[in-house]
Amino acid sequence: MGLARATAGLGPCCPPAPALLGAGLRWGGFLFAWILVSFSCHLASTQGAPEDVDVLQRLGLSWTKAGGGRSPAPPGVIPFPSGFIFTQRAKLQAPTTNVLPTTLGRELALVLSLCSHRVNHAFLFAIRSRKHRLQLGLQFLPGRTLVHLGPRQSVAFDLDVHDGRWHHLALELRGRTVTLVTACGQHRVPVPLPSRRDSMLDPQGSFLLGKMNPRAVQFEGALCQFSIHPVAQVAHNYCAHLRERCRQVDTYGPQVGALFPWDSGPAFALHPEPALLGLGNLTRNPATLGSRPISRGLMVTMAPAVPTKPLRMVHQDVSKLGSSQTPLVPAKQSARKTPSPFPSAALANSTRVFHSAPAQPRQITATSPTKRPPTKPSVSSLSVTPMKSPQAIQKAGTPSFSRPIPTTQKPTPLTSHPSPSKVSSATVRPVQKTFMTPQPPTLSPQALHPITGLPKKFTIPTVAKPQSKMTSWASKPVLARTNVPKALEQTVVAQSSVSYLGSQTLATALPPLGVGNSRMMPSTRDSTSTPAGSKKITGLEASKKTRHKSSPRKPIPLSSGKTARDASPRDLTTKPSQLSTPALVLAPAHLLSSSPQPTSSSFSFFHLPEPTPFLMLMGPPGSKGDCGLPGPPGLPGLPGSPGPRGPRGPPGPFGNPGLPGPPGAKGQKGDPGLSPGQAHDGAKGNMGLPGLAGNPGPMGRKGHKGHPGAAGHPGEQGQPGPEGSPGAKGYPGRQGFPGPVGDPGPKGSRGYIGLPGLFGLPGSDGERGLPGIPGKRGEMGRPGFPGDFGERGPPGLDGNPGEIGLPGPPGVLGLLGDMGALGPVGYPGPKGMKGLMGGVGEPGLKGDKGEQGVPGVSGDPGFQGDKGSHGLPGFPGARGKPGPMGKAGDKGSLGLPGPPGPEGFPGDIGPPGDNGPEGMKGKPGARGLPGPPGQLGPEGDEGPMGPPGVPGLEGQPGRKGFPGRPGLDGSKGEPGDPGRPGPVGEQGLMGFVGLVGEPGIVGEKGDRGVMGPPGAPGPKGSMGHPGTPGGVGDPGEPGPWGPPGSRGLPGMRGAKGHRGPRGPDGPAGEQGSKGLKGRVGPRGRPGQPGQQGAAGERGHSGAKGFLGIPGPSGPPGAKGLPGEPGSQGPQGPVGPPGEMGPKGPPGAVGEPGLPGDSGMKGDLGPLGPPGEQGLIGQRGEPGLEGDLGPVGPDGLKGDRGDPGPDGEHGEKGQEGLKGEEGLPGPPGITGVRGREGKPGSQGEKGQRGAKGAKGYQGQLGEMGIPGDPGPPGTPGPKGSRGTLGPMGAPGRMGAQGEPGLAGYNGHKGITGPLGPPGPKGEKGEQGEDGKTEGAPGPPGERGPVGDRGDRGEPGDPGYPGQEGVQGLRGEPGQQGQPGHPGPRGRPGPKGSKGEEGPKGKPGKAGASGRRGTQGLQGLPGPRGVVGRQGPEGMAGQDGNPGRDGRPGYQGEQGNDGDPGPVGPAGRRGNPGVAGLPGAQGPPGFKGESGLPGQLGPPGKRGTEGGTGLPGNQGEPGSKGQPGDSGEMGFPGVAGLFGPKGPPGDIGFKGIQGPRGPPGLMGKEGIIGPPGMLGPSGLPGPKGDRGSRGDWGLQGPRGPPGPRGRPGPPGPPWHPVQFQQDDLEAAFQTWMDAHGAVRLEQGYSYPDQLMLDQGGEIFKTLHYLSNLIQSIKTPLGTKENPARVCRDLMDCEQKMADGIYWVDPNLGCSSDTIEVSCNFTHGGQTCLKPITASKAEFAVSRVQMNFLHLLSSEGTQHITIHCLNMTVWQEGPARPSARQAVRFRAWNGQVFEAGGQFRPEVSMDGCKVHDGRWHQTLFTFRTQDPQQLPIVSVDNLPPVSSGKQYRLEVGPACFL
């Protein structure tokens, strides 16, 4: 038989088993061959077509793992022999291509075998596209099953998988039809689709198992098989494709119950199998769903009532159940609302005491069912129901457990107390190791019922009705068939009219029990989803119904050779290691003795203290043996004399139903019988001896929610929903609806005019009330009276973070100079560790072990493992021995055709014959209670439009609790599906020389290299602002980056966190006497907010109660008291950039966390494309600080999205290896300067290179003045910058800052070549008359004679510049050769009047040149572009002395030139052509003390700064009491709004005031030492067209050539559009002028060649002219940015204040910065922080350095909003240094109280501690722009529940 069974499901490829089997029995060899063939066929059949997809296997859940392989299952997935159980923690997601082959077509068949453990709305699986749209999904709702075929397309089937049963089903997706196939293809429900479904699945999408999206609720249950077949027809014969383990999982295999607490569903209590009443033939009733055999000898019944107190091992003797002190509970009450938790609800529910009497074994394999001969039933049974108290047990008819049990643990009475709300599964004490001999009940004839012959004293305990709506299992007419003899049935029927059966005390008489099955293990189905209450049936009727229709079910034996007495403790105990979920284990004490003697059904309750993953994992079951002979007498029962059990007497008449208890109160009207007319209406109620009608009986009628214990005390209505009744300031609920911001105070009077630059200081944050509904945005207040333009205000507070700009270009590449002689070779850099960094870096630090990844697609089909289970000792045998079910051939290869529906291998789904209509009733019941509303899960993605869920009745709303603490900031949610990495910006044009990347980590100091030859003279750097004096320490070896610092101190102790998930209710106390439920009291008025209590510890999870029926929707509760300020919520993402709309309300600003330790510098990720400016959201009130959520890992850098919350600082990457230095290339020819290349992405910091070889001796540089030692470096490099926030509106002009300290002398640079004329400089403001004469500058080196410039157009009259420092007289320039007199050019357009240039130095008299031939009258040439500085030619021969040039106008001092990038030290190369000065590189690590540099020239004094950008609106004012409304500040970008206060007075829009007079003159700065001559400034403003100048000296000569006749001067160049004829005419003139030379000297250049070259030259010049013109006239756009905002002030068009783009280093446009320009106050350039709550600016260091160089002063505001917290103390009597905050400047200096640098504190409201929010305003004004922006705020006081603060960082404005 075993072989037959083993081959039953081999499939069609195999020969019929019986024939071969017989042969095999005769011939061993042939048998062996047959086994091989069968095995091969099995492999072939199980492997299936190569295209079939085993989803579990594809997700890495291989069966070998399920069966005990070594590989651990993923978290939240628990393997068990038949598959995997998915818990809430399960997270299985994989790319769709890893799970489904791309060749999978649109026609599919899904074959599923599963059992749900929790009622929820989870998806079993979902396939989503790369855009996160649902493409295919299967969702199980209570009572319905939805197939989603797209985001808005779904099909619903009336299939409820949440009934605790195993369901085997298939779905066919073909064309526009979806078909649900159950019952092995016998039941099909096709549903046409209204529209075409999506064509194909997105291969780049994702496959999620158990949920719809990563944040959705998880499917919790067991999954045996999930396969997808490309042939849709598979669905019609899906049973042939079910794995054998799945076919048998609910027939022979242990049920996998809900072994974990049900949060939202009913918990389970354990009950003995009612079928144990007979103890002979223990079968599983397909209609009852709670019990699951756990292992041999053990059974766990998960019933809806689980005691909340630990159940100790208690043995009960049924013989004592009928004592007079155990009156029966009126059965009607019990029957009505009690779910049947076990196969026969006989014991769980008096209505169905025997109805699950041993059903005929249900046969699952393809053998025809065989009927069991009736056997003698036993007479006793036991129902263990959770009792409220021992007294209640007595009342409820449950036996008192008084007999001591010699177990390993002291037994105590069962005192379980169902909680009225949630009850978690009871924990289980150590399993009893020994069994007591039960005392057989002695049933005298008098003790038998006169009709049924059942023992009179046999009373069936009732189960307290759970307050739930679970429909009774009886509502489903498909019940297990009970093999009740007709005569006996009639007896029972007859008795029903006079016994308690009519009252539903007893349901059916026991069926015959086969002795041969005495070792069969009772197995029941899970009753969790078989709610009671929908259909009330008498047990008798149930019995009849069960007799009529049901498939036989096979009992499960213990082990093949063991009787219960032989069962080892291992069979009956559970190892602690196997316990993972609380569960009760119920073991028959005597374990089914087969001897024909009355049995006392004693059971041991084992309370497993720890959760058991699966009790069934206690070892593989042995192979199922044949039914043994009747075993020896069973183990001793507990009660009764210890003597051996007498021989089993003939079975009584189905076990006495027990004497009727004393008349109980008249029961409620019984449920109508399933088969009307079959129940005897006879003395209805008399049989039940209904008691007086008064007491509702222990089951009490009330208690719709709680699970009343057996005593029937109605539980209170389930605790109202997740919001518990407000206890003493109950858990603060989730943040309540935004409450009003306090009672709006009276409209505040107009506040004082804000400090300059502040946009109306944000009111102090009010106490966090219940966040009010954001009020309407107040109208703009009346404009303040235009005040005098004040001093330059500090920059306004930051606006919302702007989009991050594209990566800034590297600093301006200086004009490519001629390759200079190589500079001194630097000290050899540290030797590179390796060669150039290869493509693959060295392995990073070993990451933490990730969770088990989704296994790749397994190669070979893994189904072979199924067969492998045959090798296990028990499985094949157990499955294969369904007893009479062995005939597998009836259904042919299907193997499962016999059982109706896959659902049913229990077959319950089909209507049970005559009782079909009743079955329909059952169906609604099967839906089970609508679970209480689950706790709000994370908001999932918008789910598909599912059908509306069954609305649960709304519970009585509890009074609104106080607003709960905002919960922990959620972990940064499961990272949204990582955005795709943003596109890398376009590859910039290849710049000439890229910026040197940020210096790699300083390597070990190399030997001092030989001083190289002097480098090409760089442009003189402008005098830097005085650097901070700092000793030049060698840069310390960068310490290893510590791990990212723990998140800073917890932010202020938040008020209580969100209401945590409701802890499980604690064990219910002893059930008190039942009190009447009080009426819900009137809703109390909100009390005054109490003192904020410390957050209570999270309560222990209480046991889970039964699911209460959702109460009716209550009226909205009264608005709760304002809660404590919630912890700061995470900052919402910045919205998508909109057009600059009206100022939106500020978005909620999250509570700033304490500054974390400096994180390690993260690698700069590729900058995404800049997002558009997001709308400024409303500023949320500072929430109470929640507990710090776990920091989410940094996600992939996505497309530039809205700035999200700052991610964790990434760990510092490994240092890159330093590449070997390349040989210096030969100097290239000086090329025309190309467009600035777009900056490359910032390279990662290379690893410290190895010590380099000793460099060549460099030339000794000029000795600089030693710098003071620098301050110690900041802790670590800053992490990557976040995105750039949008710039706030300009703030008002702040007061002039004090002059900065004088800078230190820098190195004297080598005189650079004469720069090209700079672009027109910005108009300076009227400078003040200098009072002091600057120190004379050092003598300038003699510059090369410049080419004569074209006459410039007259420039606008410039403002008088400051008086420059008297420069030293330069050496006279070399005398140039006289130029060739050129033809008279056309008069060019009149140039604007140029400013008076500096007087030219008298040149040496040049040699008189020969008079050239009179040139032809030249055509007026087009105005030439200003040519690039050509390479410095070799010194020519002295020319004839030229005429003295006219003194040029003194030009304005040019702006500081952009520093060129610092190039890496190369090996000493051949001296190259002098290069153009490069842009200043990023600051390297502090090197050795350099030679002291010369002082640079003092920078131009900038104009008074304009008002800074208005800052963000301050934190919300104190709750409800708006401060006096300030007068209208200058309009700026709306700050973040605080909570909506009362609308302010409408302000008048301020009229634009006239341009203010220059601000007050700042304090006289210290005259710095005379600086070096600065580099050539950028081209100054175009001067007025000057009169034609005298001929200038000829430029330096080229290499001597044959001396030619002086030619005519080239045509003047004007930046106008060339026409070809102009070019040709001009060139013709040139040709003509050179004709003489050709004739004279015999040149024979072809004219055409010359003309072509000339045209190209002119085109190049034209291009350069346009380029320079764009530089001279920037537009402030991203493509044509200005250097700083001041550049835009001098444009011809009037610019309005607003957002512009600047590029301080004038590199390529990709690194432009979006800033806010405040032209009203002098052209301030304002940088906004990334977020207003952090001092971080998304500006590269290079750009910031240039911006500092181009600025002379800076201003910034920082506001600290505080609640009962002092942040600043300064004064003689205050310990200022300890308690005052400190601000770290950009250059590392510290602003602190009492220090050298102190901020201005214009308002210090934080010193007021009155429980309201105040603010302290710090203003930083400095003439050392390098101090700004402020990069960190330190020494902030720690936060606590009543002390909080928030930062508001304003923009840093530079002028």
UniProtKB/Swiss-Prot annotation:
Q: Where does Ca(2+) bind?
A: 1703, 1705, 1708, 1711
Q: Which GO terms describe its cellular component?
A: collagen trimer; collagen-containing extracellular matrix; extracellular space; fibrillar collagen trimer
Answer whether the UniProt record assigns the keyword Metal-binding to this protein: yes
- For region Disordered, the annotated ranges are 317-428, 511-580, 617-787, 838-1617
Q: Which residues form the Collagen-like domain?
A: 619-673, 682-741, 751-810, 826-885, 886-945, 946-1005, 1006-1047, 1048-1105, 1108-1155, 1156-1215, 1216-1275, 1276-1330, 1334-1393, 1433-1492, 1493-1552, 1553-1612
Sequence ranges of Pro residues compositional bias: 630-663, 1597-1614
Question: Which residues form the propeptide in this entry?
Answer: 49-618, 1616-1855
Per the UniProt entry, the glycosylated residues are 281, 349, 1764
- List the Gene Ontology MF annotations in alphabetical order: extracellular matrix structural constituent; extracellular matrix structural constituent conferring tensile strength; metal ion binding
Q: Which domain of life is it from?
A: Eukaryota
Mind listing the UniProt keywords for this protein, alphabetically? Answer: Calcium, Collagen, Disulfide bond, Extracellular matrix, Glycoprotein, Metal-binding, Repeat, Secreted, Signal
- InterPro entries of this UniProt entry? Collagen (IPR008160), Collagen_Structural_Proteins (IPR050938), ConA-like_dom_sf (IPR013320), Fib_collagen_C (IPR000885), TSPN-like_N (IPR048287)
Mark out the compositionally biased spans (Polar residues): 382-427, 520-532
Localization, UniProt = Secreted, Extracellular space, Extracellular matrix
Cysteine pairs forming cystine bridges in this chain are: 1685-1717, 1726-1853, 1762-1806
List, for all copies, the residue spans of the domain called Laminin G-like: 81-246
The primary site where this protein sits is secreted
Domain Fibrillar collagen NC1 as annotated: residue spans = 1655-1855
UniProt-annotated stretches for the region Triple-helical region = 619-1612
Q: Which stretches does UniProt call biased (Gly residues)?
A: 1027-1036
Stretch forming the signal peptide: 1-48
Which spans does this entry mark as compositional bias, Basic and acidic residues?
A: 563-573, 1196-1221, 1320-1332, 1344-1354
Compositional bias of kind Low complexity: 708-728, 905-918, 1083-1095, 1121-1131, 1161-1176, 1369-1378, 1404-1431, 1566-1581
Q: What is this protein's function?
A: Plays a role during the calcification of cartilage and the transition of cartilage to bone.
Q: What is known of its domains?
A: The C-terminal propeptide, also known as COLFI domain, have crucial roles in tissue growth and repair by controlling both the intracellular assembly of procollagen molecules and the extracellular assembly of collagen fibrils. It binds a calcium ion which is essential for its function.
Name this protein carries in UniProt = Collagen alpha-1(XXVII) chain
Give the species this sequence originates from. Answer: Rattus norvegicus
- The primary gene name is Col27a1
